[in-house]
Amino acid sequence: MNQKLFKQIKNEWRSNLWLALELFIVSVVMWYIVDYIYVSYALVHEPLGFNAEHCYRIDVGVLNEKSPDYVADATGEEWEEWRHTLEERLRQRPEIESVGLGFCCYPYDTSNSGTNLQYDTISPTGFIIKREMTPDFIKVFRYTGINGETPEQLAEVLKRGEILISENLLDMNENISGMTAKDLLGKDVYVNWDTTRTFKVGAVLNTVKYSDYMQGQMNRTIMLPIGTTSNANEWVVRVRDNMDKDFEENLRADIDRHFRIGNLYISNIVPFDRIRDSYLRETEQQTRNMFAGMGFLLLNILLGLL
């Protein structure tokens, strides 16, 4: 009986070898897919560090120079006054809670700006996101500090001309041992390769993710007060929680009457749930493809065992 069994195994060793190889390849692919899905699941359930619900991006355009309403030879002070007036008119709307201006810094932004930070001889390596903003930008996305600071308290830090750094700023730096971002609190640091001016670290933020699935260096952040609103390329607002309904339509209806100021006008209103969906579409499609691939492999394994 044993001889017959060994003889059968010997005769079928080639087919058994191919079966073992097939199972090995399937196992490796399955391990990769399961690992990818697990990591994605873990990432998407980590705190974002911001709240973009009830938030909108307000796109501000400039009149064409050929427009009969275009104000030629406007001074820098006039442009600044137009921007200030537009900001105040948005802020006066009863449904708007906060208005913020910034430069390449809102969540799910396809553009970003990098910087560095130096304290004494310590300088974190790798990419650090630089977010320049007005104080109320903090309130729009409700950033918070590691010591329980509220958005209002963090906004006051920016008003004082101090900066905010993320809790993970010094992570992933083997050359910085035993030091955390909290150790920089209250210290004067150099930012953006400029050693002629120092900024005081006024607070440490809870880690601010670049997007739901992002990890690593793209989540390291420095927030600075923006110099003037002329540097701002982004306008954002937070609408009161119970006043979202018809906000976009109502604001559009008032654009020509109240929001054409000098050469500036509101050109578009985009809710952040739409911005988020657009930014994450490719990643979420890839995750769905991974699920489909895992299901296909499991089906093949099941059919192979029958």
Regions from the language model: what does each represent?
Residues 9, 90-91, 255:
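Hydrophobic C-terminal alpha-helix "anchor/cap" residues
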Residues 167-171, 193-287:
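"Rare, low-scoring activations can occur
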Residues 2-7, 303-306:
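Intracellular coupling helices
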Residues 124-219:
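Hydrophobic secondary-structure segments that place a key small or acidic residue at a functional site
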